[in-house]
């Protein structure tokens, strides 16, 4: 029997893009990367675990901020190269800027406009030096 992780088309770095959506509203909260271990642990622990390319290690969403993403459903797209995580966003903040979503800017002819408010100051969320 084929392992479910073998069905995923990982990129040349062994990663797959993962989009987190609110399981109730469908709002896109963020995009991050997952490697095989991150996806396997996400399924096993029922919480979002990503691969941090900048830190080169697993990143359990909410490990510093407390803003954990509880997993409700995993979906794989038709090309098997993008994952969607349907999550419950604990604390209502997914973005390191203190906003609900990382997608808080809208394009207008004059450029990108910030349309979503900061819900909590990032300095109050993360330890010094973040």
UniProtKB/Swiss-Prot annotation:
Its cofactor is Mg(2+); Zn(2+). GO terms for molecular function: magnesium ion binding; phosphoribosyl-AMP cyclohydrolase activity; zinc ion binding. Its EC number is 3.5.4.19. Keywords: Amino-acid biosynthesis, Cytoplasm, Histidine biosynthesis, Hydrolase, Magnesium, Metal-binding, Zinc. Zn(2+) binds at residues 78, 95, 102. One of its GO terms (biological process) is L-histidine biosynthetic process. Its main location: cytoplasm. Disulfide bonds: none annotated. Pfam families: PRA-CH (PF01502). Mg(2+) binds at residues 77, 79, 81. Belongs to the PRA-CH family. Catalyzes the hydrolysis of the adenine ring of phosphoribosyl-AMP. PANTHER family: HISTIDINE BIOSYNTHESIS BIFUNCTIONAL PROTEIN, HISTIDINE BIOSYNTHESIS BIFUNCTIONAL PROTEIN HIS7. This is Phosphoribosyl-AMP cyclohydrolase. The gene is hisI.
């Amino acid at each position: 029997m084929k392992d479910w992780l073998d069905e995923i088309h990982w990129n040349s770095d062994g990663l797959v893009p993962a989009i987190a959506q609110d399981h109730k509203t469908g709002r896109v909260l963020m995009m991050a990367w997952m490697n095989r271990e991150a996806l396997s642990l996400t399924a096993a622990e029922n919480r979002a675990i990503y691969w941090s390319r900048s830190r080169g290690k697993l990143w359990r969403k909410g490990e510093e901020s407390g803003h954990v993403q509880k997993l409700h459903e995993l979906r794989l797209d038709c090309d098997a190269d993008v994952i969607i995580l349907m999550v419950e966003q604990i604390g209502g903040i997914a973005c390191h800027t203190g906003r609900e979503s990382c997608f808080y800017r809208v394009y207008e002819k004059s450029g990108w406009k910030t349309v979503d408010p900061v819900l909590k100051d990032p300095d109050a969320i993360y330890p010094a030096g973040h």
